[in-house]
């Protein structure tokens, strides 16, 4: 099923125009927010749905002027979504360990994690006949809240550090075991830093250790959404291990 942006936008623009008309009379403008279609099309157009959901954060509908601005944004949203998707293609997915824990590098690191997860999912989708097709869609759906947080640069710093560390080791040849070790730290609530990488300074680690304080609750127990995306990261690690071993044997 393709994402029918045209019909979504047509309905939303019509709603906003009615709100604008009502705001000129006695009735106050409606404050109901448009809910993004987060999961209906996740298998077909995940990045497009992500960008649509992210775009919704910037739409305001509290006053008449805001409604006019919202209508304008809704009308040109497809173009802005396509521009954002095109921009994604210019970003390298290679994670630089020196960026892990850096405040300045956090937005870029978040996007790298987002795009690398998409890359792994693309490889899995291309391998569905050979590798666990029954797990694929559920894994993508479970990862969707994480992908949104990464695109919006809203993932908690300690979770981002641990996730980026897992993905960094996953990108390195023959470091699956280090990725698994880092994943275990992520699961139990410890901050996982790249193992054996001196470019991640002791000062960055110390600063984040102080921010984290004594909290050591298992991340997997924070809430159901967090539990699901963390367990889905383990599925990505397992898939990459299978994918690498199968392609190495064919080389």
From Swiss-Prot:
One of its GO terms (biological process) is mRNA splicing, via spliceosome. Its main location: nucleus. Keywords: mRNA processing, mRNA splicing, Nucleus, Spliceosome. It holds the Pfam family Prp18. The keyword Nucleus applies. Component of the U4/U5/U6 snRNP, binding principally to the u5 snRNP. It is not absolutely required for the second step of pre-mRNA splicing at low temperatures but is required at higher temperatures. It may stabilize a particular conformation of the U5 snRNP or orient the U5 snRNP within the U4/U5/U6 snRNP or within the spliceosome. Belongs to the PRP18 family. The gene is PRP18. PANTHER family: PRE-MRNA SPLICING FACTOR-RELATED, PRE-MRNA-SPLICING FACTOR 18. Residues 17-67 are annotated as: Disordered. This is Pre-mRNA-splicing factor 18. It is found in: Nucleus. The keyword Nucleus applies. Homodimer. Component of the U4/U6-U5 tri-snRNP complex composed of the U4, U6 and U5 snRNAs and at least PRP3, PRP4, PRP6, PRP8, PRP18, PRP31, PRP38, SNU13, SNU23, SNU66, SNU114, SPP381, SMB1, SMD1, SMD2, SMD3, SMX2, SMX3, LSM2, LSM3, LSM4, LSM5, LSM6, LSM7, LSM8, BRR2 and DIB1. It comes from Saccharomyces cerevisiae (strain ATCC 204508 / S288c). GO terms for cellular component: U2-type post-spliceosomal complex; U4/U6 x U5 tri-snRNP complex; U5 snRNP.
